[in-house]
Amino acid sequence: MKKLLPLCCWHSWLLLFYCDFQVRGAHTRSHVHPGFEVLASASHYWPLENVDGIHELQETTGASRTHNLTVLPSHNSTFVYTNDSAYSNFSATVDIVEGKVNKGIYLKEGKGVTFLYYRKNKTSCISNPAQCGPEGVSFSFFWKTQGEQSTSIPSAYGGQVISNGFKVCSRGGKGSVELYTHNKSVTWEASFSPPGHYWTHVLFTWKSEEGLKVYVNGTLRTSDPSGKASPAYGESNDNLVLDLTKSYENRAFDEFIIWERALTPDEIAMYFTAAIGEQLSLSSTPPSFSVTPTVNTMAPTNAYHPIITNLTEERKNFRRPGVVLSYLQNMSLSLPNKSLSEETAFNLTKTFLNTVGEVLRLPSWTAVSEDSAVVPGLIDTIDTVMSHITYNLQASKPQVAIVGSSSMADFSVAKVLPKTMNSSHYRFPARGQNYIEIPHEAFHSQAWTTIVGLLYHSVHYYLSNIQPASTKIAEAANYKNCLLSATSYLISLEVSPTPKLSQNLSGSPLITVHLRHHLTQRQYTEATNESNRIFLYCAFLDFSSGEGIWSNQGCALTEGNLSYSICRCTHLTNFAILMQVVPLELTRGHQVALSSISYIGCSLSVLCLAITLVTFAVLSSVSTIRNQRYHIHANLSCAVLVAQVLLLISFRFEPGTAPCQVLAMLLHYFFLSAFAWMLVEGLHLYSMVIKVFGSEDSKHRYYYGIGWGFPLLICIISIVFAMDSYGTSKNCWLSLGNGAIWAFVAPALFIIVVNIGILIAVTRVISQISAENYKIHGDPSAFKLTAKAVAVLLPILGTSWVFGVLAVNNQAMVFQYMFAILNSLQGFFIFLFHCLLNSEVRAAFKHKTKVWSLTSSSSRQANVKPFSSDIMNGTRPATGSTRLSPWDKSSHSGHRVDLSAV
């Protein structure tokens, strides 16, 4: 702290000096800094640091008020030496307040609580700001991150300041102030960057008609002018407490001051400059102010060297992005207000940006995109440093420009007189496909104009997973579950005074932003997927609320495609192209229609498949039904039946539950088994029609291994490696997000391709036979054989699933309906073509009926001759000549292909 000249030391010295001046009268008022008068008007003051006895608990009897400062009688005064000031050594007498617990302000510590503020009325202006009247109230303190508590400096440690009326806290890399009025039940809240390793001054004011304002290091950072209704306040403390939170880092407080009125911006500026030991020059138009250096106007490069060196050394200890951000923010606020030569400004800019670039490459930053506040906060800090450099850049000629490149960004720092600009526009960068252009007519000021340009090289990689609800992009908020991500470089341009631009996007002049897209592999895959809609937004980081929020207000995308975007904007700031990928969703009408088709079709299929299995079981004694072809039909029917029953049941379970997860595993197995048996159907058809090989018995065990064993193996592997992918998304099925769905899609696509090939080959053979039959017999019905064969084979080969591949977007809606109809009715078509309309099944059923009839009559007439054993064995009895069907004619024609398999 001594090394860096902390702000709190100046504050302590100034207050002690002023108290000594009032008590002893050793000086004249003409030499007093105007900030002393602001300090003297305070209602209460606690030094907290470097004050012996501050941790002792004492009774406050006979407390008196002197010079508007809360003090004790002189015999309780504490004599303080402040000998660590970089400017001079002084000693003075300061009186502090100490008293009973439950009466005011406290320090929370491991050994207990130290009393600091005594007030008989618990509903005071401090504990309830509504009691302050129209004058309002102001609270001021210094705050910083403290790594380890020092035993030699009894600072007040804590992570928050709380009372019954307000709370100041720092959590997760974000500072905030909350203020509550009990009579109207209204809460005011404002956020700001929390302190880091440097002392940071926080001052906030509140007035009923102005609301809450938060000043950090003398500058207004954020505000809440209106507040919001709040029936209950989260904390309940009649006293003011400096609290030690459970955060991983400690924070130290110093110089706590209360004014029972709202300070003006000028008063805040005077007080802050007095605290840091600078002279104040007030302008005629408050609240702006400038700090006038007390030394020569030119500062050598080494005036900034300690800060850069310290940053380079400290980054070795950085592990968490929030800590890094706090450190950089406080470093940016501690830069000296000294003039910079061009060489010094260039070295400082490049060193700072290179250092930040090295910090971004730390392993802890790989997941920083999950924290939406860290990267915008870092960008805001960089803007602060660059603005400081530009403001202090010494202009020795009408145009001063510093242009360079670092590992972090390309940069341009310029200070120019607009009248010396000869071109029709100002462009940054001067070359390349990523740039911002400002028309010359927008530069209306005749005074010095500062321009800061930054083109970040890799920050866009960290601008992903942006929640639409946390942005000001209304269009993106319509798809709250679809995250935003940057697809271009982040480019920044700041001009002061602000250019005069049209406030209407249809007017002129406007800013032109041209950005090339740099898509990751994942972004490109999603953008080119026809099942997704892509939205591109010209967005910028809006820091008006104290934190960076993405917005597209005042910007419009005028031209572009997947490679680039051109935007027109009414303002300057940090720009990037954000992409939002929205999966295509069906309208409510289509969803209801497709769901109804699925329910009705699956229910009908379940009934038909059950009838089919019962029919095959009853007719299993007939030889024509007992062959391998009908065994395969029965196994396929069983797999499809169980899969569709489970599918209907799964609609009743909530995703993410254990039953839903179990159902997803069973659905995976039985649907995969259904596809496997479709493959068996194709292989068996190929062996019977195209290439006859082996006996049925030799292939039997292979078919069962393919139909039931292979799907089981795939499911076991999938469950072992992707257990969490089952039943966790929108339904009881495999997750689409992590690739687990390919454990079903890949085998299914393979089977569809194989079966389509088999279907084509079989269709060619049938077509040849049909043509031959037409030539020999002249039967025109033979041409119908091809169409009939295809219709019969489609349900058992599963080729109708190809419509699922074609149904990828709203433009292919007809394929979605075809897919829903054909696949939900797969069981019905199996029953129709391979049971109800199948000539062999009908013949077997007739024979079985005759057997039942003869068996029944034989029990009544013993002399009735039993039915032929051939019929019992399933062989066809000799019958009279019948007209040959086209298929029978084909066998008589001498063709060696057996089409009974079809």
Curated annotation (Swiss-Prot):
Residues 111-304 form the Pentraxin (PTX) domain. The gene is ADGRD1. Keywords: Cell membrane, Disulfide bond, Glycoprotein, Membrane, Signal, Transmembrane, Transmembrane helix. One of its GO terms (biological process) is adenylate cyclase-activating G protein-coupled receptor signaling pathway. Residues 1-25 form the signal peptide. This is Adhesion G-protein coupled receptor D1. Residues 574-582 are annotated as: Stachel. Belongs to the G-protein coupled receptor 2 family. Adhesion G-protein coupled receptor (ADGR) subfamily. Residues 870-884 have a biased composition (Polar residues). Residues 538-585 are annotated as: GPS. Disulfide bonds join 538-567, 555-569, 660-732. The Stachel sequence (also named stalk) in the C-terminal part of the extracellular domain (ECD) functions as a tethered agonist. In the inactivated receptor, the Stachel sequence (also named stalk) is embedded in the GAIN-B domain, where it adopts a beta-strand conformation. On activation, the Stachel moves into the 7 transmembrane region and adopts a twisted hook-shaped configuration that forms contacts within the receptor, leading to coupling of a G-alpha protein, which activates signaling. Forms a heterodimer of 2 chains generated by proteolytic processing that remain associated through non-covalent interactions mediated by the GAIN-B domain. In the inactivated receptor, the Stachel sequence (also named stalk) is embedded in the GAIN-B domain, where it adopts a beta-strand conformation. On activation, the Stachel moves into the 7 transmembrane region and adopts a twisted hook-shaped configuration that forms contacts within the receptor, leading to coupling of a G-alpha protein, which activates signaling. One of its GO terms (molecular function) is G protein-coupled receptor activity. The chain crosses the membrane at residues 599-619, 631-651, 662-682, 703-723, 740-760, 789-809, 813-833. Glycans are attached at residues 68, 76, 83, 89, 121, 183, 217, 310, 330, 337, 347, 422, 504, 529, 561. The lineage of its organism: Eukaryota, Metazoa, Chordata, Craniata, Vertebrata. It holds the Pfam family Laminin_G_3. SMART domains: GPS (SM00303).
